[in-house]
Structures are given as C-alpha cells and as structure tokens.
C-alpha cells in the first residue's frame, strides 16, 4: 500500500562516515551522500521534495561499542528541494562542540508529497 499526503516519510538513510568516504548502508529516496567536510554531510534526494518546508530528524554515534560523548545534529545550510545538509557535533563536557564523523548516522525526512 502506498502512502501519500502531508507529513509522510520522504526519505531516510543510515550512513557510515568514519572511513573518509560516506557510505550508505541502506536508504529510501536518497541517491547519494556528499562529504562536505568533517561532520558535514549533504543528503541528496532521488526524487525532489515539492518544497523546502520539510522536517529532518537525525541521530548519530558508534555502530559498535559505546558513544562516549553526546551528539547533536544541526542543519548546516538552508534546506533545498533536492537535498539537505547536516552538521554532526560531539558535545563533550558542555562545550560548544566539535564537528565529528561517526560510524552511524541516521536521518529521516518528512515532507509533503
């Protein structure tokens, strides 16, 4: 059964960015991931969104072992109908944060269809 309408999942992905090349483990409607720099990834849609008023949720950490410091993910650029960009930050000891690549980054994007 196809699901259409407002607030549906437009795209999702699970990626690995530790190796120096962002690798998509699995995804839906994500054609590629562009490594912009340490802790910065651009997720490119296979099919564009109808507008740039969509919501993105992210989480990151380690695939195996413990994630030793909290993480936060923030938009890194204005959303675009063709892609969105995030910045993955390591927040250790309540500092301002350091951009970090992680072995596990999950994103989900909900948008009008």
Task: Give the label of every model feature segment.
Residues 1-50, 90-113:
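Extracellular receptor-binding modules and their adjoining Ser/Thr/Gly/Asp/Asn-rich linkers
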Residues 51-79:
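Terminal beta-strand-rich extracellular "head" domains
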Residues 37, 70-92:
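Ser/Thr- and Asn-enriched, surface-exposed coil loops between beta-strands
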Residues 16-22, 31-32, 58-64, 79-85:
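Short linear motifs at secondary-structure transitions and domain/linker junctions
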Residues 56, 84-86, 107-109:
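Hydrophobic beta-strand residues in large extracellular and virion-surface proteins
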């Amino acid at each position: 059964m196809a699901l259409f309408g407002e607030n549906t999942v437009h795209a999702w992905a699970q990626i690995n960015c530790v190796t120096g090349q962002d690798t998509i483990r699995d995804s839906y409607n994500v054609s590629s991931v562009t490594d912009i720099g340490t802790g910065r990834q651009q997720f490119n849609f296979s099919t564009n969104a109808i507008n740039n008023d969509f919501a993105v949720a992210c989480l990151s950490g380690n695939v195996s072992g413990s994630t030793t410091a909290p993480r936060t993910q923030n938009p890194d650029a204005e959303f675009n109908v063709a892609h969105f960009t995030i910045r993955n930050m390591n927040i250790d000891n309540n500092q301002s944060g350091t951009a970090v690549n992680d072995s596990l980054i999950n994103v989900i994007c909900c948008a009008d269809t």
